[in-house]
Amino acid sequence: MRPAFITCVILLLFSSTETFAEDFEKTEYKADSARTLQYALLEPQKVEAGKKYPLLLSLHGAGGRGNKNWERNCLANKILSGREMRSQYPCFILAPTVSKQGSWKSESMDDVLELVEKLLKKLPIDPDRVYVTGQSMGGGGTYEAMARKPELFAAGVPVCGGNKVENAKKIAAIPIWAFHGEKDRVVHVERGREMIEAIKKAGGKPRYSELPGVRHNSWTPAYKNQEMWKWLFSQKRTKTKSS
């Protein structure tokens, strides 16, 4: 009996952490530009009639480029697709991807934002609760998405990402909680600091968590931070933010 019990426990643990990918529906979007954008979409476990849900735009890092399992490259997807989290924070998760040589600072971001607008019309999404997050290249993409369409987002969580400080003025009104590892040598921590300081100078009030001793993998403590998720899903777009 003991081996059978152990096997059941292992299977339960495996299913709770690995089957999340099966719940993401992978498809593609033909943009107005005629470009094709591949993406994965996770819906709430139960969509109730007449109710609207948040949408989280989740951007992968460079390791997800040209990867057939790109949705696994952002830890946020795995965390939020767990049973308890899906129950606590029912939402739509949009996880697009770029080509092997692509970037979130390219025309691909225009296609992503166009897709978000289409989904807002098609699905029961609360337009005042559209969020964006991403790690590494996706962290930079988080800043980029907010800068290109600041009126769209209620909040953003860039993780170990940087962007042009010139964009700070565009996103200063958006609630932001950024994370960066103190010892990051891939996307140097100075880039994160510079962006936060620029946002503050532009009148913003971003939250910034610099993680002592942490290198590039700051997404692990960031996305396992329950306070962050509680904060993110409590944010709502206001007239001031969308003006």
Model-based region annotation:
Residues 45-51, 100-137:
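Gly/Ser-rich "nucleophile elbow"/oxyanion-hole loop immediately N-terminal to the catalytic nucleophile
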Residues 17-55, 133-135, 140, 145-148, ...:
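A domain-start/cap signature at the N-terminus of enzymes
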Residues 171, 177-180, 184:
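Short beta-strand/loop motif that positions the catalytic acidic residue
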Residues 183-188, 217-218:
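Acidic catalytic loop of the alpha/beta-hydrolase fold
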Residues 71-72, 188-198:
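Short alpha-helix in the alpha/beta-hydrolase fold that links the catalytic acid
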